[in-house]
């Protein structure tokens, strides 16, 4: 099958591999992007696909805490200029409060709820669109709860480009919970702990690592031991509690919180626009440059 430039671009963004390597991988896998990622990894050309592989939209993430409840919200705009607008920032905060007030479970349900002034959230967003002059949309939100013996950690990076909400059980040290939220913003783990990783994901990773070791020419009798070591490293990379704490790399996140009497039980990390299609700018010029 013909491999499109768009597909090559997507694989490059996922893996960081070179254009020709990506094209070959897609050709070998009949254009299946997930199989192409594995192909590149097995050849030692690429690391695991990034979690936030395609980021394009602008906007803000906001975290609103109230007692034993907290909400994290992402609202998108078209430009970064609008994301810095005070009116837009106020809208995002207002929507986060509305999430806590209404207990809405979906964006659609939230849009139909009424604000204290009697207007629906949908009306409020449309008014903001008219005033600001850009398309705005509520993309997603999440609510977390805790007890009086626990703590929330809220951290916003780059003024709300990345937002994290953590739930730490057994400790009321909100500063420690915030430090862990900062760690999660920086390192971007997928899970709290290895207990959350599915058996299917572990089996898939084990297969990829085994093929990778065999392709490196390692003797069959030591491959299994190598695979288990690399699998432990992989799990450390994707599980928050096993990672070296950014503020003190000599201890893990789990050890840091344990010293405060707490345990990380949940987190939500939003990065503005993650997973959304990028605008296709300058890729044709890049292709032309490669062909010279």
UniProtKB/Swiss-Prot annotation:
It holds the Pfam family EF_TS. The keyword Coiled coil does not apply. Keywords: Cytoplasm, Elongation factor, Protein biosynthesis. One of its GO terms (molecular function) is translation elongation factor activity. CDD domains: UBA_EF-Ts. Associates with the EF-Tu.GDP complex and induces the exchange of GDP to GTP. It remains bound to the aminoacyl-tRNA.EF-Tu.GTP complex up to the GTP hydrolysis stage on the ribosome. This is Elongation factor Ts. It comes from Staphylococcus saprophyticus subsp. saprophyticus (strain ATCC 15305 / DSM 20229 / NCIMB 8711 / NCTC 7292 / S-41). The gene is tsf.
